[in-house]
């Protein structure tokens, strides 16, 4: 890494001061077998899609089953899109029925492993049968197309069955992460006006069981729309079943036949709601619709993961988040892939659970989060190196930008320097991957998502909307509609327009800062909320974090700002150390000098606090908002509903920097 000065940068730009010069071409053995095998092929595909997007997306859509073909590929009345308008289809039919009619009927769709080691395999034929049966259960319960269904379960195959059954009958699923508390469920159920809640009695996590049904009972005291609760027996928790309201999954499945005609729904028929936290106020119900989401989920999965019929693909996300929706359920099943699904924690019973899984199940593709990778680094290399990971051929990351040093560790120890890494950028709102290497074509650099997918028109712009120069930090926007884009924030079009479309008229604003390097690769610099003005320089805190993590003593770091009378803002770093290192004044000084050397004196933290752990959401993202509050006042006033471990906050209060 080295510092670089950006020329011709406007005062409205975000300073980009971190440069990465390491580059890794795709292995020849991988490229020769991949769907997109050269940059020339990628460039042509990208240019063709840019020149005629209707043809590009229309050709992809032709690969699916339609009950009635669309009249037009896109009707765009900014900021509202209608994709494949006039067509009718069913995404569950395309996930299951098309495969059941082929040799894939007996192919494994889901290989599931419970935290306790128990295993289940569902073939496409068996998954189709179970989904059809549960779709009939929903019909028995009075669910009609357009009705909302809330789902609150751990990572068990029945969660996939419930989701696809909703899609089969045209109901709108609203999956709520099984780590959320009662209040969060109440909010989401009431906002969506769900008629039914599907839950498990309990779930397993790190050797313990959590009673989910009791949480649901508390949540639905104030949810007048809920008429029925369907309960799946998973852990055998002691629960109370309310007469007339609560019904056992297995009892209802016993009443249902195993054939169910799919609802023929309009292309723009709502498919699901997924709630994402706003910086303030109530959660946003992101609405995705059927056909456009189907086309992009399937095509992005095929090309980014270079999927083959013999692959066993392991995505470590939870289905309660968008990654689980698109890249555990819909993307893989639309492609007839085999998905490995794991119930529990990555460090139970020990830190090598994932590596043991990869070895035993011969996983070929691993898609995980930088947060997990940093935790594995901290745990020690020996947990990885004692397992045979030779089955892996491709690695992926998702959820946040990956620090270059974490990328290098992933490449060396997990990929054994032979697996391409697809560092993917996308959002709940985008529905699918937007920026990513093509693993058989794109030379990768540690820490960048590289180039946009064909058909995706992104740019980095200044505050006035004009394109930035190379290496000039700016704002990441999408300049054209894409099929899997969110259609609105449910029940709040005004908030949708203001949040995503008001900052740069005619362009979707992602909320992220970014820069393009000399190769046109896009570097995500973090949320614009995390851009700090220090002595007139606007710095992306993710670059300061990357510099800190490149120090040999640092496992993880988060950098935020607090007001400063002289500088405007001061940088405060919360640092988690690797085992064997002591947080003291000498190391604090060493870290400051290291950042100054890597980036420049302007980026040197004014304050460094030692942290045993960082506050994270239940999906593993660092809650920088809480750290900003701690840095400013050492108190937390905001919402902590999505915080995974409240004990982390108390520890950070106690660890307030002595100077």
From Swiss-Prot:
Tagged with keyword Ligase: yes
Enzyme nomenclature, EC number: 6.2.1.1
GO CC list: cytosol
Record-listed ATP binding positions: 399-401, 423-428, 512, 527, 538
UniProt GO MF annotations: acetate-CoA ligase activity; AMP binding; ATP binding; metal ion binding
Post-translational modification comment from the UniProt entry: Acetylated. Deacetylation by the SIR2-homolog deacetylase activates the enzyme.
Reactions listed under catalytic activity: acetate + ATP + CoA = acetyl-CoA + AMP + diphosphate
Presence of the UniProt keyword Metal-binding in the record: yes
InterPro entries: Ac_CoA_lig, ACAS_N, AMP-bd_C, AMP-bd_C_sf, AMP-binding_CS, AMP-dep_synth/lig_dom, ANL_N_sf
Record-linked Pfam families: ACAS_N, AMP-binding, AMP-binding_C
Sites of N6-acetyllysine modification: 621
Cofactors (names): Mg(2+)
EC category: ligase
Keywords for this protein: Acetylation, ATP-binding, Ligase, Magnesium, Metal-binding, Nucleotide-binding
Binding residues for CoA: 205-208, 323, 347, 535
CDD domains tied to this protein: ACS (cd05966)
SUPFAM superfamilies to which the protein is assigned, alphabetical: Acetyl-CoA synthetase-like
Role of this protein: Catalyzes the conversion of acetate into acetyl-CoA (AcCoA), an essential intermediate at the junction of anabolic and catabolic pathways. AcsA undergoes a two-step reaction. In the first half reaction, AcsA combines acetate with ATP to form acetyl-adenylate (AcAMP) intermediate. In the second half reaction, it can then transfer the acetyl group from AcAMP to the sulfhydryl group of CoA, forming the product AcCoA.
Family: Belongs to the ATP-dependent AMP-binding enzyme family.
PANTHER family: ACETYL-COENZYME A SYNTHETASE, ACETYL-COENZYME A SYNTHETASE 1
Protein name: Acetyl-coenzyme A synthetase
Chain's gene name: acsA
